[in-house]
Structure formats: C-alpha cells, structure tokens
Amino acid sequence: MSQSLFSQPLNVINVGIAMFSDDLKKQHVEVTQLDWTPPGQGNMQVVQALDNIADSPLADKIAAANQQALERIIQSHPVLIGFDQAINVVPGMTPKTILHAGPPITWEKMCGAMKGAVTGALVFEGLAKDLDEATELAASGEITFSPCHEHDCVGSMAGVTSASMFMHIVKNKTYGNIAYTNMSEQMAKILRMVANDQSVIDRLNWMRDVQGPMLRDAMKIIGEIDLRLMLAQALHMGDECHNRNNAGTTLLIQALTPGIIQAGYSVEQQREVFEFVASSDYFSGPTWMAMCKAAMDAAHGIEYSTVVTTMARNGVEFGLRVSGLPGQWFTGPAQQVIGPMFAGYKPEDSGLDIGDSAITETYGIGGFAMATAPAIVALVGGTVEEAIDFSRQMREITLGENPNVTIPLLGFMGVPSAIDITRVGSSGILPVINTAIAHKDAGVGMIGAGIVHPPFACFEKAILGWCERYGV
C-alpha cells in the first residue's frame, strides 16, 4: 500500500492552516485547501455558549420560536400601496431628522462618505445654503441622527433619508406592518453613493417635485402591487434583486405605467419619468429592500428566537439585530468589499461596506440567490460556479427555504431563509452579501461592486448576548 502511495502523483486535501497547502503548491503538488474554521472560530467562550444553547432546557422553546420566525418570513405578503414624503409617513420623522444606514452612529464617528451624504441632504432640505454651512449644522447638535431600521425604514448605501424625500410604502398584508424606503436616484453620482454637488441636489428636487407626486398619484389609481409575486418572477428572469434588477425594474414600471398615464401629468413630465427609469436598471432595487424589510420586521421580537432579522452597515460598523433580542444591535468593524473597480479606481479608493441593502440577503435574495443571476459575476466578480455555490452554501446557515421565491437552477429550491446565529457560529460560514462600492471620499459616487461578509464579531456578540439575556 505504501509503495503504491508514493509511486503515483499525490492529490492532497489540507484542513486548517493554509501554510501547509501553500508549501505543497511550491513543490508542484496538487492540493485542495478545505475552507474550514473551527466552531466559534476557535473562541472557547463562544464554543461553550453554543454548547449551552444546544443543551439548554430552553431547546424546545428555541426551536418553536425559530419555527415561528421562519413561518412569518415565508408567510409575509408585502405589497406596494403608495408613495409619499417621509415627513408624512415615517414614524419619528421631523424636519430636522436625518435617517442613515446601519447601526446607530454619531456625526463625529461617521465616515467621510456618510458625512458627505448628510450635508447634501441638509442643503436639499433648505436647512443650509451650502455644504460648509451644512457641516456646521450637522456638528451643532441641532440635527437628530437615527438608523433607518429604527423607523421602519431601510436606506441604500449611505441610506440618508430626510423629511421631503418621497418614500415607498410597503404593507405586509399578512401581519399588517409597514416598511418604507426612499426612491432610487439611479446609479453612480448620487446622494446615496455620497455625491453631493448641485447636480445631485437638482435631481433630488426633481424627484420631490415631479416624480414623487406622479408615482404617489399613480398608486392611488392602481391601489396595490403584489411585490412577493413580482420578486418571484424577477428571480426566474435572471435577477437576484440586490445588484441585478433588469427584470424587476421592467416588471415594476410595467405595473406602474397604467397609473402614471392616468394621473393627469403632462406628456413632457411623463417622458421625463420614463427616461429616468430607463436610465438605470436599479429603479426597483429600493422596492425589494422595503419588501424584505416588511417581511423581516414581522419576524422580529419573537422571544427565544436566534434568527437574524437585520444586517446593516454604516461605513464604520456592521450591525446585526436578532429576533429574540429586540432593541439591541451587535456590531463589528465594517469590511472592505472585494470586487471589480471601475476604470481609474483602485481598492484603496473604496470606502468600507455601507448600506441597509443587506436586508435583501437577510430575507434570502441578493447574495443568497446568486444562482438565479449568473450574469451578475460580470459586476461583482467571481465565477458562475461560485455564484451558484453561494446559494447552496447559505442553506447551511439558515433554518429553511422560502417556497414562494425559488431558484430554477437548483431545482426550484426556495431561497435560503432565516439566518440562525447558532448555525453561523457552529459552522464558521458567514452570510454572503453582494454590494456596490462607494468611494471613501464624499462627492465621487459609486466606483465598483463586489462581495463582502459580516465580521464574525457580530455573531460572537449576538450569541453571547443571547445567552446573557436568557440565562443560558
């Protein structure tokens, strides 16, 4: 046996430290490095906590709570019911409130990119005459800063949301809760991508004065649009509905058009809106975010549950919220997004991971559904095989599949749903997120897209926090 082993080429599988496989590669030995980490990433306090949860007398209650959370996600039926200005509909919004993406953060601790979006919003609202005055106002303490997620909202990239901005209004028909998000400015040099010059302000003014009222009045005629059904259709047409929205945008504007042409606006204004929608496939991106938010909020606040209901980033920290731990954020450092850069930019130009758009992955689409959108690898990098494998791998850290939203390429498997902090902690597999990359400095905009994962520290804190809360 030993003679046979050494008389043929070796094909080695290495588990653990990569230095061993690296050394074999230098010797021209075929080697496969197994992507594996120990439970709790080797932190014995986390390993003990995971064991305590698994062996807890509360095990039956945990299982029942998690089943309820999964069912609430699956049974949620979000529909678009309207558009209106944030001051009219968003809980807690005031003329001097600025909502932002991610977990809570103060002006002093915000990254430069988010500060740029905030100052742009203050100029747009007429609270400052220019960016310098806006910076002084933001630092004065007169402005209230708060996470979108704590106001039933989500916000793409910087997520900056102010009183005059028009919002999607999405109702969960099953459970009655409502979620909001602002409208797409389309792509590249825009406020959510932390650009803030006069062209950005002019576009926001037009959205407030023309597009917003037109879509508001159109929805009064239409009544409601079934977003869960539309999402399922978009995934079957090649979108993953986070960074690829070709089909979703077509379906959404198709549904809105009858209301638009009956709403009494001039042909010229209608033309402007249709041209704006046609300028970028991202028009439906925020719509899916609000849809996912409506579903995930329905699963939040279930005692004993270990299901993740929020993943969000503010450019400094990545934050999680867990169903059974309402009112708490578990944070770790925001990561650098890895992926192709636009011409003229390099990785060191990029800001850290930012935005509430990871609510899509929390629900089970976006990075979790990349097998529906193999063409997305041209934007975010990687291979088609890797995109497909992401969808398979995410099933290992979730409690089930959503039969309402399926992946044709994987035998119409439902998208992986209900991320479980204990499964992440035990397996070492982190949720995959595909996302845009904003420049680290204000005023530039989007410079690429790629793949990112939460820091394990978020899950570590959540696991330990759960044990502390429930005395395990």
Model-predicted segments: where are they?
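Anaerobic metallocofactor- and corrinoid-dependent redox/one-carbon enzyme cores
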Residues: S2-V472
